Amino acid sequence: MTRLATLFAVFVLLMPAAARAADTAAGQAAFAKCKICHTVEAAGRNLVGPNLHGVFGRKAGSVDGFAYSAAMKNSGIVWDDDSMANYLRDPRGSMPGNKMAFPGVKHDEEMANLLAYLHQATQ
């Protein structure tokens, strides 16, 4: 039994911190700031910001019917956890010229929770 417990402990320690700490309910609460401008539903419409349904694996600036900035359209980003976290930490600093007027997510735990929620809500 001790060997199994040790293997489990090693596995948990090797998991990325974001995966260990992610709380989708807290992420949904964090998304409250985002849903003023974004929807996540499959048939959701674009608001001030684009619909985020299916965002992971999608090329940035590619939602039909949304008027993106040239910076976003030409960024070459395909959204994954790293690119999303980098952008959401400092939207204006990470992509000068984009339109998103959001100061950024400043805390790692909030970011992990938000990403976990987005993965769940945007599939």
For every predicted segment, state its role.
Residues 1-5:
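Positively charged n-region of N-terminal signal peptides that target proteins for export
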Residues 6-16:
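Bacterial N-terminal signal peptides
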Residues 15, 39, 57, 89, ...:
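Residues at helix-coil transition
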Residues 28, 39-80, 102:
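Gly/Gly-Pro-rich "capping" loops immediately C-terminal to redox-active cysteine motifs
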Residues 32-40, 114, 118:
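The canonical Cys-X-X-Cys-His
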